[in-house]
Amino acid sequence: MITWNNLDTLTSFKELENVERVDLVKAMAGENGAERVKNYSVPMAEGLTYNYAAKQVDDKVLAALAKLADEAQLTEKFEALYNGEVINTGEKRLVLHHMTRGQLGEAVEADGVDKRTFYTEQQAKIADFANKVHAGEITNGAGEKFTTVVQIGIGGSDLGPRAMYLALENWAKKNDTFKMEAKFISNVDPDDAAAVLNSIDVAHSIFVLVSKSGTTLETLTNESFVKDALKNAGLDASKHMIAVTSETSPLAKSDDYLAAFFMDDYIGGRYSSTSAVGGAVLSLAFGPEVFAQFLDGAAAEDALSKNKDVFKNPAMLDALIGVYERNVLGYPSTAVLPYSQALSRFPAHLQQLDMESNGKSVNRFGEPVNYPTGPVIFGEPGTNGQHSFYQLLHQGTDIVPLQFVGYKNSQMETDVVIQDSTSQQKLCANVAAQIVAFACGKSDENSNKNFEGGRPSSIIIGDQVNPASLGALLAHFENKVMFQGFLWNLNSFDQEGVQLGKVLAKRVLAHETDGALKVFSDLLNI
């Protein structure tokens, strides 16, 4: 039987608090460090590896973390989730994003249908539509092929799909699977939509409107912006727009769209990249086969997350170490540092994934918790970040755990040799150097040049960013966040924190304000 308990009530957590702290500088020095790098490593799916040698752990800490995983019933809770139990307690909903890429357990029926069948049917419909667009069977009003796809959405309807598109754009061009350029409109700031519309040929563009409810203010505002641009160009908007929405939304059967593809209430926006939300734009941009490879990579990583052995379950181990850093060592934030320009927007997606899921101060029963929960997530690609905020990471007063991601090979495979090394070798040399520099530091009599070290990090290493490895990387972090939510006894699948601002904004627009809200509204000339 599964029990849901706060982290600070677990016996194994109290034992973890009493385990002797690791001196990371000493642990990573010399041959000790070399042995840790060899031994503290867990295989992931699709050729990826999670290496935690530079984390502030040793065998004693790891043994305590394994006990915590057992007592917190992490794999049992994951099993309950993928077998269709109501895990989103706040909204009384199932949590089924894993089922968009595979079936990990029992068949799950909801709304009178088998959910795995529902998701695969939507994927098949999207694939058929995308293939017809690419073949010129579905065209604009003049019978001409579409060349650009524009996604209109916000939050999870934008951040994840945008990050995945950018991650695979150059790979697709190199591998001759690039079909259409993709653009994204998300912000209600009119300059966002105007800039995108000014950069494309609207006559040859197809727009994907993404709104589960069909009532999202920002998205519908931007849809009107786009429809106005199409009308001004003498075009029929209904020949240029498709919808990704729920079957019960007002968009589902509207004549305003070429086609509608469906999601449901069991997939949160930040977990929706492997659903129709990501499927439509990625299939149009790169072809359905590429999206299928992306799903396969995610499914393979999901399968690893079922393993009860924490040392064969990279997402669970990553989650446990993160909770140790947050709740025992007291570190307030985590930097995500991919050494790949392809992953330029991946930190922004992970920021939403993590902070919207676990940025909670009450447990799944609505009771206040007495311990820190989700960390602040931020990051930029390397080596750019080294010349930006790494100064604070190396010598600041806060210790910030680091999550590196690095690849042995570039996507474009175009490179030059300068000073006896390629650009890719320089990139990889920098990430290796940073891990050791953060961990070991460097003593100097000049205090301004002294590096204390003891800055923990992990790295996920792969051969190349491709559809399958990207899917595995995404699933790793989704499952890490899930496991941490289980440990903190949170509901990681709602986001009430976004609601209050929306309510107040509607009051401002209706001029129903007083006090500070009225004064701020007047200052902004609303």
Residue ranges of model-derived segments:
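Extended, charge-enriched "interface" segments that sit outside catalytic cores
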Residues: 4-142, 420-428, 439-440, 462, ...
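Short glycine-rich or small-residue beta-strand-to-loop segments that form or flank ligand, phosphate
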Residues: 147-155, 207-213, 333-340, 377, ...
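Short, solvent-exposed amphipathic alpha-helical segments in soluble enzyme
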Residues: 164-169, 198-202, 224-226, 350-358, ...
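Active-site phosphate/pyrophosphate-binding segments
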Residues: 229-414, 453, 500-526
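Basic, glycine-rich polyanion-binding accessory segments appended to enzymes
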Residues: 410, 457-471
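Acidic, Ser/Thr-rich peripheral helices and adjacent loops at domain boundaries
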Residues: 413-449
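C-terminal structured subdomain/cap of oxidoreductase catalytic cores
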Residues: 449, 465-517
